[in-house]
C-alpha cells in the first residue's frame, strides 16, 4: 500500500471530523463528558481496529482521548489510515 502525499492527505481532511495531519500521522482529540465515556469509546474503537487489523495509537488523559493513525509498516499515512479515521468518526459520532 502506497504512502499518500501531503496533498492527498490534505484533500481528504475536510471529510474527516476534527482530524489533522501532524508529525506524519493523522490525529484527532476528543473531549468526553466523563472519563468512563472516553473509556467506552476507546473500547468500541479497539473492537473495530482489531477486526480490521489496523490499530491506532490511543492516548487517554482524563476526559480527553487522542487517536493517532499511521501505517507503521509503510512509514506514513495510507488509505488504510483514512478508512480507519472514517470508521472512528462513525463510532464517535453515534
Swiss-Prot record:
What Gene3D superfamilies does UniProt report for this protein, alphabetically?
Answer: Transcriptional coactivator/pterin dehydratase (3.30.1360.20)
Coiled-coil boundaries: none
Keyword Calcium applies = no
* Top-rank lineage group of the source organism: Bacteria
Q: Does the keyword Mitochondrion apply?
A: no
Give an example GO biological process.
tetrahydrobiopterin biosynthetic process
Give the catalytic activity. (4aS,6R)-4a-hydroxy-L-erythro-5,6,7,8-tetrahydrobiopterin = (6R)-L-erythro-6,7-dihydrobiopterin + H2O
The molecular function terms of the Gene Ontology recorded here are: 4-alpha-hydroxytetrahydrobiopterin dehydratase activity
What's the EC number here?
Answer: 4.2.1.96
Sequence similarity? Belongs to the pterin-4-alpha-carbinolamine dehydratase family.
Q: Which PANTHER family does the record match to this protein?
A: PTERIN-4-ALPHA-CARBINOLAMINE DEHYDRATASE (PTHR12599:SF0)
User: Mind telling me which HAMAP family this protein's record contains?
Assistant: Pterin_4_alpha
Under which name does UniProt file this protein?
Answer: Putative pterin-4-alpha-carbinolamine dehydratase
Amino acid at each position: 500500500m502506497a504512502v499518500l502525499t501531503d496533498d492527498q492527505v490534505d484533500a481528504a481532511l475536510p471529510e474527516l471530523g476534527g482530524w489533522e495531519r501532524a508529525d506524519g500521522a493523522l490525529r484527532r482529540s476528543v473531549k468526553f463528558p466523563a472519563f468512563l465515556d472516553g473509556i467506552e469509546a476507546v473500547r468500541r474503537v479497539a473492537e473495530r481496529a482489531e477486526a480490521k487489523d489496523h490499530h491506532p495509537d490511543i492516548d487517554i488523559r482524563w476526559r480527553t482521548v487522542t487517536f493517532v493513525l499511521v501505517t507503521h509498516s509503510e512509514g506514513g499515512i495510507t488509505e488504510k489510515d483514512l478508512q480507519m479515521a472514517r470508521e472512528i468518526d462513525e463510532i464517535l459520532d453515534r
